[in-house]
């Protein structure tokens, strides 16, 4: 699957047209036959019709409520209680709800389960509604946002160390002229990419992005798994060009590149989708980067999965190549490192620029440690900016900008003295500064640790606004006066437990225990009864009311003043959106370079060197994931060389299972990825020619969803390699042909080796158990034979994991089966069958010769009788009851001697 989450159709598609009609029908059905729905329910039904196939979070006070089928779905998904509110057609209306203050966690679970959620929030307070339409007025509500997997910005809903891509795909042209356009945006950071490609490259590009959500036209042929179908009208290239120009605020797109019709269609659809999700407002998007596919190593979906580049076979980060390499200390750095490994470069100059920066930090351990220490304290500037632009920001986000930009200035001072100065660092340094005015403003305006919730105030620093300070002073004096009133009331009433409390309904009030309430109930007491509860009675008094009014008014005015300042501060920050985004990107690049330097120093990695010809010369190469796993067990990874050249561009590798063939293949593919991503590599030395495309056919499993067996999956992947690999490609093939009959598999493997050698002419490592393939070395000039070494010692197989020249003498399959725990009778039978097969092949040259000599019923095969065991015989002859102590001691010594002789 290309999308991590699968979703249904979007409003406007044929599927949704059906759901809309159903919603309209349901709306009619929900109306009681004898009476209209209540005003609140009528409002809900109208909003639900607008939300269409999304779950509707309907704000009621401090909760988001869901009704009808939405409630049933949410209660099952969230494991919360399903209750009822009112009736419909004589039946209770299902209802469930979640607290508004903790809604993000529930949203995350719903999104992960594949749902989309429309947020219907209150657009006014109850007090404002009363002013507008009287005491029975219904609070206004509107859908303010549609939450989908690709439109998230909240910290609680995102993985801090992974990008969150929303992708739109569009096509243009027919037949050989057909082209695909892709627009991808991570709105949490504003990153925006546009690319054009041929249809056959679509799967590889989607695999690179690993999108959270994919949007395609409703009539798109063979849509990616989990894609959202959207009306074709949103994918018109002319409208797409207009949307893109409006987004960028330009009259022409000439300054951003020559976009194709397909690219404009995809970009326009992406922008329209984001506008729909934001209910008319757009999130933060940087100017689009036009991605040229040829500038990056092409890696298809099957190869990414088999090499476990960013995710392991289990679908998690742990155990992946990224996990083994990652030493970043910021979320932004981790995201950038993942992007680098997912799209290695093909331009030697750009690769060397990255390696130069890594070399600077690797060579200066003190500088590297100071840099990493400073980066550890950095907030996620990019995502804080994304939330602010999307109008989902908080005072804390402004505080993160303040702290992050201030730290960037200090890093500029630290790194500005570096010598020699790498070109990449020289380009990054100017992006770290220029924010002094904004940082100074935020430092003066905000408290040291601003809160997430702006509703309660308290985030504007004292001294920034004298008028605000005066309002706060009035509120403080009022609260002191209320405390004095509490002491006075206690003295006047003689009730020592009397308290003045505050809540959102009654405001400030006097509370006494019920047993003390009667004297306060009298008309001349000076107190007014407000509420009776179990055990307590609540009152008000004129002077308390007067002080409460003063506190309330000053508090309201203070909150309004803080809100106005918050808007001013946000506007100041958003006025530097592009510059702040550039700083965030520069900080991430520094983190990646320092992290790779740390990894290289930690693991003894080396800088790769690039050659103009198609060599692949790696000395002492290692697999970083396997090496880490082996080291954790206290063992040492066995390094191996891989020396491909124009004269030996295809290595045929044989040897036993578990001998290390697959690891050898994968480690060299991993080295190619790391090198072209701009990273040192786990080897003693490495000289490489640029790899334009990387292919891996290692391991396979049934694809039941698409009706493909393991062998069919293997053949589809092999066919793709033979069709797409060029002379600059690097291919690893493991056990091609093993999923069918021996003769068929051997024939296919033979033909594939010939095709790779004669037609594709690419660098290739081919692992096999078909020893017959070694004959190809006699006529294929650029093919050389190699094997992983193994020995048998005292009947046991010893796997050396070393690569040697020449073919393996045998596969040691039965020895490996013994290691796996097959029973002695089965192993004995296997040896008997193997002897007859090998004897037949030696006599006739036929693989199946000798089968006729085997007994008809294999299960009846006789197992060789075990040799006599002297130790066992000695024990069986002992008469325990007749032994004297001295005889027993002599027998023990004799048994010990027999045991030692048996062990030898």
Swiss-Prot record:
What are the UniProt keywords, alphabetically? ATP-binding, DNA damage, DNA repair, DNA-binding, Nucleotide-binding
Pfam families named among the record's database cross-references: MutS_I, MutS_II, MutS_III, MutS_IV, MutS_V
User: Would you tell me the Gene Ontology cellular component terms?
Assistant: cytosol
| A biological process term (GO) from this entry | mismatch repair
- What PROSITE patterns does UniProt report for this protein, alphabetically? DNA_MISMATCH_REPAIR_2
Q: Sorted alphabetically, which InterPro entries does this protein's record hold?
A: DNA_mismatch_repair_MutS (IPR005748), DNA_mismatch_repair_MutS-lik_N (IPR007695), DNA_mismatch_repair_MutS/MSH (IPR017261), DNA_mismatch_repair_MutS_C (IPR000432), DNA_mismatch_repair_MutS_clamp (IPR007861), DNA_mismatch_repair_MutS_core (IPR007696), DNA_mismatch_repair_MutS_N (IPR016151), DNA_mismatch_repair_MutS_sf (IPR036187)
Is Protein biosynthesis among the key words of this record?
Answer: no
Q: Which domain of life is it from?
A: Bacteria
Which residues does the record give as ATP binding sites?
Answer: 655-662
Q: Which GO terms describe its molecular function?
A: ATP binding; ATP-dependent DNA damage sensor activity; damaged DNA binding; mismatched DNA binding
Q: List the disulfide bonds.
A: none
**PANTHER family for the chain:** DNA MISMATCH REPAIR PROTEIN MSH1, MITOCHONDRIAL, DNA MISMATCH REPAIR PROTEIN MUTS FAMILY MEMBER
Q: What does this protein do?
A: This protein is involved in the repair of mismatches in DNA. It is possible that it carries out the mismatch recognition step. This protein has a weak ATPase activity.
Cross-referenced HAMAP family: MutS
Q: Which family does it belong to?
A: Belongs to the DNA mismatch repair MutS family.
Please state what the protein is called.
DNA mismatch repair protein MutS
């Amino acid at each position: 699957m290309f999308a991590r989450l699968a979703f249904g159709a979007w409003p406007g598609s044929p599927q949704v047209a059906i759901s809309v009609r159903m919603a309209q029908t349901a709306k009619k059905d929900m109306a009681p036959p004898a009476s209209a729905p209540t005003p609140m329910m009528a409002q809900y039904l109208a909003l639900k019709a607008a939300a269409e196939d999304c779950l509707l979070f309907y704000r009621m006070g401090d909760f988001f409520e869901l009704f009808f089928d939405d409630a049933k779905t949410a209660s099952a998904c969230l494991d919360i209680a399903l209750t009822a509110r009112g009736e419909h057609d004589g039946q209770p209306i299902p209802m469930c709800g979640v607290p508004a203050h903790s809604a993000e966690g529930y949203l995350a679970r719903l999104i992960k389960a594949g749902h989309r959620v429309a947020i219907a929030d209150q657009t006014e307070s109850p007090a404002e509604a009363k002013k507008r339409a009287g005491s029975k007025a219904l609070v206004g509500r509107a859908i303010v946002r549609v939450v989908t997997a690709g439109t998230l910005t909240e910290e609680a809903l995102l993985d801090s160390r992974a990008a969150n891509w929303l992708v739109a795909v569009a096509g243009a042209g027919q037949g050989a002229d057909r082209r695909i356009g892709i627009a991808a945006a991570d709105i949490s950071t504003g990153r925006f990419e546009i690319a054009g490609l041929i249809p056959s490259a679509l799967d590889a590009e989607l695999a690179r992005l690993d999108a959270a959500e994919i949007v395609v036209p409703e009539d798109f042929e063979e849509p990616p798994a989990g894609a959202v179908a959207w009306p074709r009208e949103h994918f018109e290239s002319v409208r797409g060009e207009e949307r893109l120009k409006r987004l960028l605020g330009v009259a022409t797109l000439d300054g951003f590149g020559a976009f194709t019709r397909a690219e404009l269609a995809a970009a326009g659809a992406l922008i329209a989708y984001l506008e729909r999700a934001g209910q008319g407002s757009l999130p933060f998007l940087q100017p689009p980067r036009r991605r040229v596919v040829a500038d990056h190593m092409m890696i298809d979906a099957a190869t990414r999965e088999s090499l476990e580049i960013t995710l392991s076979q289990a679908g998690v980060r742990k155990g992946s190549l990224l996990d083994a390499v990652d030493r970043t200390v910021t979320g932004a750095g981790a995201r950038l490192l993942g992007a680098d490994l997912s799209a290695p470069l093909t331009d030697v100059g750009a690769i060397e620029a990255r390696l130069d920066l890594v070399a600077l930090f690797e060579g200066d351990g003190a500088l590297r440690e100071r840099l990493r220490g400073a980066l550890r304290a950095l907030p996620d500037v990019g995502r804080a900016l994304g939330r602010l632009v999307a109008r989902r920001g908080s005072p804390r986000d402004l505080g993160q900008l303040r702290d992050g930009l201030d730290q960037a200035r200090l890093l500029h001072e630290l790194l500005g003295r570096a010598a020699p100065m790498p070109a990449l660092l020289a380009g990054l340094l100017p992006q770290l500064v220029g924010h002094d005015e904004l940082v100074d403003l935020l430092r003066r305006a905000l408290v040291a640790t601003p809160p997430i919730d702006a509703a309660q105030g308290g985030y504007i620093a004292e001294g920034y606004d004298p008028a605000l300070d005066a309002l706060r002073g009035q509120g403080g004096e009022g609260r002191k006066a209320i405390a004095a009133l509490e002491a006075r009331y206690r003295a006047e009433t003689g009730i020592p437990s009397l308290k003045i409390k505050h809540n959102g309904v009654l405001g400030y009030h006097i509370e006494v225990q019920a047993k003390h309430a009667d004297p306060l109930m009298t008309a001349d007491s000076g107190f007014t009864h407000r509420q009776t509860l179990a055990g307590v009675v609540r009152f008000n008094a004129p002077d308390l009311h007067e002080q409460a009014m003063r506190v309330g008014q000053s508090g309201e005015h203070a909150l309004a003043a803080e809100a106005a300042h918050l808007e001013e501060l946000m506007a100041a920050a958003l006025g530097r959106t592009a510059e702040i985004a550039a700083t965030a990107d520069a900080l991430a690049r520094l983190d990646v370079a320092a992290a790779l330097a740390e990894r290289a120093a930690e693991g003894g990695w080396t800088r790769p060197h690039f050659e103009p010809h198609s060599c692949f010369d790696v000395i002492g190469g290692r697999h970083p994931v396997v090496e880490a796993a082996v080291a954790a067990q206290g063992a040492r990874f066995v390094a191996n060389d891989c020396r491909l050249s124009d004269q030996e561009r295809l290595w045929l590798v044989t040897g036993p299972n578990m001998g290390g063939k697959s690891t050898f293949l994968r480690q060299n593919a991993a080295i190619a990825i790391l090198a072209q991503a701009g990273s040192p590599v786990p080897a003693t030395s490495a000289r490489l020619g640029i790899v334009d495309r990387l292919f891996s056919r290692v391991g396979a499993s049934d694809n039941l969803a698409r009706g493909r067996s393991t062998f069919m999956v293997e053949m589809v992947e092999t066919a793709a390699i033979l069709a797409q690999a060029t002379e600059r490609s690097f291919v690893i093939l493991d056990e091609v042909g093993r999923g069918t009959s021996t003769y068929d598999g051997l024939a296919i493997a033979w033909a594939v080796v010939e095709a790779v050698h004669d037609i594709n002419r690419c660098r290739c490592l081919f692992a096999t158990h078909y020893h017959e393939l070694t004959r190809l070395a006699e006529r294929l000039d650029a093919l050389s034979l190699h094997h992983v070494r193994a020995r048998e010692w005292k009947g046991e197989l010893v796997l050396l994991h070393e690569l040697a020249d020449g073919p393996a003498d045998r596969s040691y399959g039965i020895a490996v089966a013994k290691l796996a725990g097959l029973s002695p009778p089965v192993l004995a039978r296997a040896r008997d069958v193997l002897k007859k097969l090998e004897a037949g092949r030696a006599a006739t040259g036929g693989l199946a010769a000798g089968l006729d000599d085997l007994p008809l019923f294999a299960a009846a095969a006789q197992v060789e009788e075990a040799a006599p065991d002297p130790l066992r015989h000695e024990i069986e002859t002992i008469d325990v009851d007749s032994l004297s102590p001295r005889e027993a001691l002599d027998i023990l010594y004799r048994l010990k001697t027999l045991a030692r002789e048996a062990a030898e």
